[in-house]
């Protein structure tokens, strides 16, 4: 087993592809998303993506994906009529597989609970 090393240029290229896929295809809405799925979407190997996350971006795959999920939740709150959804249903639409995981990541990311965010952002 050899360690994958990627140049800064290669990391920048992969990150650009990854950002494009995340923003346009929203694979993070799949609660069962694996890093191998993301690697396939951007046409790279899993260990290259792992290097990108751990060495270049200094974060885990799950932290990266959950950042997008939290942002998606915020977008839904701001752009749609959420009154007919429960918090659990909204979190599932964003790709979280459990309410507990959603609350934990949301609070870690924003410093407030999802309910507080909704209260502060509903017009």
PLM-predicted stretches and their roles:
Residues 101, 110:
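Ser/Thr-centric signal marking residues that sit
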Residues 46, 98-100:
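The DNA-contacting recognition helix of HTH DNA-binding domains
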Residues 1-89, 93, 105-108, 115-116, ...:
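Membrane-proximal linker segments that couple transmembrane helices to downstream signaling/catalytic modules
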